[in-house]
Curated annotation (Swiss-Prot):
Pfam families according to UniProt: DHDPS
Active-site residue list: 134 (proton donor/acceptor), 163 (schiff-base intermediate with substrate)
Gene name of this polypeptide: dapA
HAMAP family: DapA
Residues with site note (Part of a proton relay during catalysis): 45, 108
Protein name: 4-hydroxy-tetrahydrodipicolinate synthase
Length: 297
């Protein structure tokens, strides 16, 4: 069985000035389950994991697992450019009941493809739950090549798939060809969900689902149920919104949008800062077009 099919929200982390707002996080989790979200990723890029302490990350993972209470899968972001640190977070996530892990390729230290094999194999050796690799070269300055997944899989059976955010459809097609249907491919880009699903992808780990979870669930479910035309039409309809949510570095626009829409998810953490006035006005105009923001806002 795959970790999930359909829409997994890369959920934002609500903050107060003093820490994680667990009351608000709990509200968001309940809302996502009600809206049909198929899985929740906690402590991903969109959740600002890079500016959370280890203690905050662990508390957020534990809280999410307990709040969800097995109603849908919980995927914990446990990646690091320090293999030992990734192992520590991964072991913790498994110990509190996470269903799977999302582990980003190492960033900044720019290892080789051989190093990627060693990194993921070593993490996988310390846990039993499924691991989804996260390939996002625009953030890491490192691209995991299709043949490297095969080398990892030979040594680590619990590496089950990839969140592919390279934007390179040819590369994703090659991963699908080399790895076969048992290897789970998830879109890491909201504007490429249906193209990737057409190559055998099972869904998306989504930023946009933070504000329209029911729509992203509906789109992916349509494709999975064979209604290709509906899924395609929804992808095209939503792409201007997807674009607006990446007009500045993620998660600046999506968190701003959520606050504009009344979700009250609190501030960004430095070094992320508020949007420029020009981009803010553009975001507002797009949200209004989709009926997500009242005209007076």
């Amino acid at each position: 069985m795959p970790v999930f099919k359909g829409s997994c929200v890369a959920i934002v982390t609500p903050f107060t000035e003093n820490g994680v707002n667990f009351d608000k996080l709990g509200e968001l989790i309940e809302w996502h389950i009600k809206e049909g979200t198929d899985a929740i990723l906690i402590c991903g890029t969109t959740g600002e994991a890079s500016t959370m302490t280890d203690e905050e990350q662990k508390e957020a993972i534990k809280f999410t697992v307990e709040k969800v209470a097995k109603r849908i899968p919980v995927i914990a972001g446990t990646g690091s450019n320090n293999t030992a640190h990734a192992i520590e977070l991964s072991e913790y996530a498994q110990s509190v009941g996470a269903d799977a892990l999302l582990v980003i390729t190492p960033y900044y230290n720019k290892t080789t493809q051989k190093g990627l094999v060693a990194h993921f194999t070593e993490i996988a050796r310390h846990v039993d739950i499924p691991i989804i690799i996260y390939n996002v070269p625009s953030r890491t300055s490192l691209n995991m090549l299709p043949e490297t997944y095969l080398e990892v899989k030979k040594k680590a059976e619990n590496v089950v798939g990839v969140k592919e955010a390279s934007g390179d459809i040819s590369q994703i097609a090659e991963i699908a060809r080399i790895m076969g249907k048992s290897f789970e491919i998830y879109s890491g880009n909201d504007d490429q969900v249906i193209p990737i699903m057409s190559l055998g992808g099972l869904g998306v780990i989504s930023v946009t689902a933070n504000i329209i979870p029911a729509k992203i669930h509906e789109m992916t479910t349509a494709y999975l149920n064979g209604d290709i035309e509906k899924a395609r039409d929804m992808q095209l309809e939503l792409n201007p919104l997807n674009k607006a949510l990446f007009i500045e570095t993620n998660p600046i626009p999506v968190k701003t949008a959520m606050n504009l829409m009344g979700f009250g998810v609190g501030p960004l953490r430095l070094p992320l800062v508020e949007m420029s006035e020009k981009n803010l006005e553009y975001l507002k105009s797009v949200l209004r077009q989709y009926g997500l923001l009242k005209e007076e806002n």
